[in-house]
Amino acid sequence: MIAVSGIPGSGKTSLAGIMAQRINKLHAQQSPDAPPAAIFVPMDGYHLTRAQLAAMPDPAFAAARRGAAFTFDPEKFLRLVTKLREPLLDTASTPTIYAPSFDHAVKDPVEDDIPIPATSRVIFFEGNYLSLDKEPWNTAARLMDELWFVEVDFETARRRLIKRHVEAGIAKDADEADKRARENDLVNGREIVENRMPVQEIIVSREDSAWGR
């Protein structure tokens, strides 16, 4: 169980996904009839729903800060990790465990949408706060076999976030996207960097169009 974290725009999602794909490609070459060995579980499904944000004391602030640590359900994530940490006695009789995904069209989580079969041997978790040294995030982190952190400078992250927010329709133009990046994403990034637990691997994110091919 490997938790890949980093500030928004660091490239952690790309890294975790590519690592799982490469492991599965190598595994398929060696054991063509075997099920995939690696799986990728993003933390997006642990966002609080829009209804939950609307029920907060300051719903406008909660909506504007969506993506901050307080807009996630870390206890729910901890329950998943705790369940996956239990000893695996019999692959054939162990039921599949499910994690939530996130539907960007409706902007809310989708329950039980990511199957994690008992045949999984490497699980990559990905999310901003997976090495955050605050309860209960750090409790979940201590259940991992390794913590990886994707490091990037804040200016590079800001440029990536502007592009991402415009392309995803989160912001109508670059100015609005820049405002969101500076007032939300990079504020969260400061908390992540300043409260990071010790990690086993630090991966420096660099621009390389050929990487991952």
Where are these regions (language model features)?
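Hydrophobic positions on the alpha1 helix immediately C-terminal to the Walker A/P-loop
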Residues: 15
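NTP-dependent small-molecule kinase module
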Residues: 162-170, 180-213
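Post-Walker A helix-loop "phosphate-sensing" segment adjacent to the P-loop in P-loop NTPases
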Residues: 21-38
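Conserved nucleotide-sensing/catalytic segment adjacent to the nucleotide-binding pocket
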Residues: 39-42, 46-106
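Walker A (P-loop) phosphate-binding loop of P-loop NTPases
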Residues: 9
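ATP-dependent NMP and nucleoside kinases share a basic, alpha-helical "lid"
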Residues: 106-164
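Conserved lysine of the Walker
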Residues: 12
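Short hydrophobic/aromatic beta-strand immediately N-terminal to the Walker A/P-loop
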Residues: 1-3
